[in-house]
Regions:
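Conserved catalytic-core segment of NTP-binding enzymes
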Residues: 122-124, 131-188
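ATP-dependent carboxylate-amine ligase catalytic core
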Residues: 8-11, 15-18, 44-130, 146-148, ...
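A conserved segment at the C-terminal end of the G1
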Residues: 24-25, 33-50
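C-terminal helical cap/extension that packs against the catalytic core
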Residues: 174-193, 205-208, 269-270, 310-339
């Protein structure tokens, strides 16, 4: 992590990020879903929108897209050939190169607005060289404690590092310790903080989630109570960007959003989720029990070796009728025996 390498690489590329209108998103859980929802609402409103997220689920190209079209292999190869001398000289990391690629791609495609998700933390994240029009903060909880800090306050300070001078912040509801840190940072930066209200009247089914917020009832194609919260935050963000965005555009964007790996129905009564920290897994289990209150749950679990295993084990204990564990041959995942 750090900013100097990214700045040097972007300078070589003639600073493609500087004239982009940007929404910058940080937080612990829900960043991708919130970013994808903002993206779809803005597209439905007639904007040409770039989206940069990480990590990818299936292939690298997913990280960078414009109006539903991912960056092509040819565009990736062309960019890498162009930037290779600078990368070798600067000794750029994978994420620094990927971030520069996103900005270059968005400038090349002349987007109206780019939605940029932080990779890890905020303060020293490679994306934190932008001067956005809006900062968005999803719920902050414990994750990546070996890098960001071992308390919620330390992690919140890292995330709050993306709040810029006089740039408004819209945040999801946060625990008091986090809220105090965000308030302090926005005050220091002469900014203003808006707190998104929690959605009400949430209803889940296999087709999505309906909820009420800002006096209207909406439905997102994503499943989960937390997806109602993510959608509410996305609606609030788009209304700050453009107060004239219509309810029709919001409705269309919410129904069109597709973000695989988030309580995704892959087959009859089989759901897949990429939750990888305690708060995320608790949310998944809570929503499954809401959807299937009288059913036994059977699970398949695999985790990378850098996760807080003890906390995760405690929160899934006794939640399943039967739990299977799996690993991978590449050594990235914990062994089945340890799990």
């Amino acid at each position: 992590m750090g900013l100097n390498h990214t700045l040097s690489l972007l300078k070589f590329l003639e600073n493609p990020h500087k004239n982009l209108k940007i929404i910058h998103i940080a937080g612990t859980n829900g960043k991708g879903s919130t970013a994808a929802t903002i993206y779809n609402i803005l597209i439905s409103s007639g904007y040409k929108v770039g989206l940069y997220t990480s990590p990818h689920l299936i292939n690298f190209n997913e990280r960078i897209r414009v109006n539903g079209v991912t960056i092509t292999d040819e565009e990736i190869i062309s960019f890498m050939k162009h930037v290779e001398p600078a990368v070798n000289e600067i000794k750029s990391t994978f994420f620094e190169v990927t971030t520069a690629m996103a900005f270059y791609h968005f400038k090349d495609h002349d987007v109206d607005i780019a939605i940029i998700e932080t990779g890890l933390g905020g303060r020293l994240d490679s994306t934190n060289i932008v001067n956005p029009s809006l900062t968005v903060m999803t719920p902050i909880s414990l994750d990546h404690m070996d890098i960001l800090g071992d308390t919620i306050e330390k992690i919140a300070k890292e995330k709050a590092g993306i709040i810029k001078e006089r740039v408004p912040l819209i945040t999801a509801k946060q625990v008091n310790e986090v809220l105090k840190i965000l308030e302090k940072r926005t005050k220091k930066k002469s900014s203003v903080m808006y707190i998104c209200p929690n959605p009400e009247s949430i209803q889940l089914n296999v087709d999505g989630t309906s909820f009420e917020v800002f006096g209207k009832i909406y439905t997102t194609s994503l499943i989960g109570c937390y997806q109602a919260q993510n959608a509410a935050l996305a609606i609030a963000a788009t209304k700050i960007i453009n107060p004239k965005i219509s309810s029709k555009s919001i409705d269309k964007g919410l129904r069109n959003v597709h973000w695989p790996g988030r309580l995704q129905l892959v087959s009859d009564n089989i759901y897949y989720d990429v939750a990888h920290n305690e708060s995320g897994i608790k949310s998944v289990l809570k929503n499954l029990k809401i959807m299937f209150p009288n059913s036994n749950l059977y699970g398949l679990l695999c985790l990378k070796g850098d996760k807080e295993i003890d906390c995760i084990a405690e929160c899934i204990k006794s939640q399943f009728e039967m739990l299977f564990v799996s690993t991978s041959k590449d050594g990235l995942l914990l062994s089945s025996k340890k799990l």
